[in-house]
């Protein structure tokens, strides 16, 4: 349970439960594929030998689409045929299976490069929605699979795909009776992980810059919490907050010029705005309670954060500039924490204690209703995908923590692969 509020470490023990205030406004939407669009992803026809283990890009595309919750992918063993494009597709057979879409393609070696053609077909109309051709190095086939997945997703759903994006997270392993913490970056499906930083002291709260070229995070390498910003291209890392007491929970402003952070330099944990070009800090909250875990609204005008000023942890908002005081957002349940604002500004994801379990929920700011998306019992650290259509979080608690994704409609929930140890604190 300690990690459910680990951005303030042992202060988490102060944040315990309260009786639910508006239980009728809590909706469970866990599991099921109702409303998902049926699609068949055909293994790409291959001419010649492709010198890479990533040649089955259809499998990557299938996994991506299924994980989104927007598609119900036909199992490969149920395919009635394996067309390579529009010209050799018998649409009547796929209509009989109830398919809405087909994804087909071909691959062949062209010198030292691979020529790849893919088509997205509309089964009902019997036509081609999209078709493209690529020529690339075999090592880039997995990236191409993510790009094709993004195209299919956007053509069908109307939202940008996120399969070609990257995630950051913290991996924890035991080595020679010591706990090793690693800051990692990987593809959105958890594949191709690479290490950014290793430490024998805790690393927490990674956060992407808006340009996605820098990570802010908390490190205890100096014996206490400090906030760093690291450039992923150059590797340069700068310590930007090392005040007395707690330095935690960095969150980027949409313009990339500021970080909202939690500091206790004045004796209490409050939210501050830190200007990156000169290090100037401005206090945004001034309360005896614990104020922590800030997250910006997409327009940068407001910040949501966790506070126990009402007696138990709940989500509040405040205006970054100008008039407007602190407003309480959540009243459903006895514990709501770790808010993350959706890219469209309409929802806040959070950790919600429901029926004794810590679960991921989404609070709709317009309807003021809370939807529970996961089963728990130890789910934490939710973060929206860049398109707002999925949420990544850490499940399993401190003993067996791993990353999972859940669609915002609750249709799909899948675990990401892990090479070893525990995976937690995702940033997307």
UniProtKB/Swiss-Prot annotation:
GO cellular component: periplasmic space
One family name in Pfam for this protein: TolB_N
Top-level lineage group: Bacteria
Gene3D superfamilies (UniProt xref): TolB, C-terminal domain (2.120.10.30), TolB, N-terminal domain (3.40.50.10070)
Keywords from the UniProt entry: Cell cycle, Cell division, Periplasm, Signal
Signal peptide residues on this chain, from the entry's feature table: 1-23
GO terms, biological process: cell division; protein import
Main location: periplasm
Cellular compartment(s): Periplasm
NCBIfam families: propeller_TolB
Subunit structure as annotated in this protein's UniProt entry: The Tol-Pal system is composed of five core proteins: the inner membrane proteins TolA, TolQ and TolR, the periplasmic protein TolB and the outer membrane protein Pal. They form a network linking the inner and outer membranes and the peptidoglycan layer.
Biological role stated in the UniProt entry: Part of the Tol-Pal system, which plays a role in outer membrane invagination during cell division and is important for maintaining outer membrane integrity.
Name of the featured protein: Tol-Pal system protein TolB
Protein's gene: tolB
């Amino acid at each position: 349970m300690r990690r459910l509020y680990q951005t303030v470490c042992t202060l988490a023990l102060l944040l315990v439960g309260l009786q639910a205030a508006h239980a009728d406004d809590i909706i469970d939407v866990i599991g099921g594929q109702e409303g998902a669009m049926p699609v068949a992803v055909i293994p790409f026809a291959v001419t010649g030998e492709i010198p890479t283990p990533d040649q089955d890009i259809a499998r990557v595309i299938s996994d991506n689409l299924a994980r989104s919750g927007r598609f119900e992918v036909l199992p490969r063993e149920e395919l009635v045929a394996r067309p390579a494009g529009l010209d050799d597709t018998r649409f009547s057979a796929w209509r009989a299976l109830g398919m809405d879409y087909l994804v087909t393609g071909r691959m062949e070696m062209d010198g030292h490069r691979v020529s790849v053609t893919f088509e997205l077909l509309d089964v009902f109309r019997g036509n081609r929605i999209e078709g493209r051709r690529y020529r690339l190095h075999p090592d880039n086939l997995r990236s191409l699979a993510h790009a094709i997945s993004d195209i299919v997703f956007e053509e069908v759903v109307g939202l940008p795909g996120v399969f070609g994006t990257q995630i950051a997270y913290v991996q924890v392993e035991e080595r020679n009776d010591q706990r090793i913490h690693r800051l990692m970056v990987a593809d959105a499906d958890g594949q191709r992980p690479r290490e950014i930083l290793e430490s024998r002291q805790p690393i927490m709260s990674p956060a992407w810059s808006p340009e996605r070229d820098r990570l802010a995070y908390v490190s205890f390498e100096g014996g206490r919490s400090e906030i760093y910003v690291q450039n992923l291209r150059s590797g340069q890392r700068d310590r930007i907050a090392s005040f007395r007491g707690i330095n935690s929970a960095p969150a980027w402003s949409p313009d990339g010029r500021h970080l909202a952070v939690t500091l206790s330099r004045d004796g209490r944990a409050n939210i501050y705005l830190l200007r990156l070009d000169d290090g100037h800090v401005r206090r945004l909250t001034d309360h005896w309670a614990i104020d922590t875990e800030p997250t910006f609204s997409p327009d940068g005008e407001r910040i949501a954060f966790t506070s126990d000023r009402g007696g138990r942890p709940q989500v509040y908002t405040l205006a970054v500039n100008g008039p407007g005081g602190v407003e309480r957002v959540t009243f459903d349940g006895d514990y709501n924490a770790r808010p993350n604002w959706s890219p469209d500004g309409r929802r806040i994801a959070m950790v919600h204690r429901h029926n004794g379990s810590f679960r991921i929920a989404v609070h709709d700011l317009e309807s003021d209703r809370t939807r529970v998306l996961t089963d728990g019992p130890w789910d934490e650290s939710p973060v929206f995908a860049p398109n707002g259509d999925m949420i990544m979080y850490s499940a399993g608690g401190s003993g067996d923590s791993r990353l999972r994704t859940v669609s915002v409609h609750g249709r799909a929930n899948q675990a990401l692969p892990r090479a070893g140890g525990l995976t937690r604190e995702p940033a997307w």
